[in-house]
């Protein structure tokens, strides 16, 4: 049954700095059907911008977000949510191909590392 399933979008829930994203993910075990994952960088409490996916480039611990998804046995699709325009790309704002591709590779790398370290 897919009633009351949801898409977790960390960049939406993460705009409230009081939200513990990994904890929220764990509390929604079995209800998350799709995950949009990206990083944000806070400039102040209410001012933020989308950042590259790497944890060091923003305010979210991307490893902990992906680990929370892994820990709950998430098997749905995970995609990078939005992308910056980089390397001179001209595209629809927010949907830069290169940054989304880098994000997808990074998220896959995190997942593989978590999976391999959990198998020990």
Q: Where in the sequence are the language-model features?
A:
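Short, small-residue-biased leader/transition segments that mark boundaries at the very start
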Residues: 3-8
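C-terminal helical cap(s) of enzyme catalytic domains, especially alpha/beta-barrels
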Residues: 91-119
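A structural motif corresponding to the C-terminal end of an alpha-helix
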Residues: 1-2, 65-75, 107-118
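Generic beta-strand/beta-sheet core signal
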Residues: 9, 37-38, 81
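Glycan-recognition surfaces
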Residues: 9, 33-34, 108
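Gly/Pro-rich active-site loop or hairpin
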Residues: 13-75, 89-101
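Short acidic/histidine-rich active-site segments
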Residues: 77-84
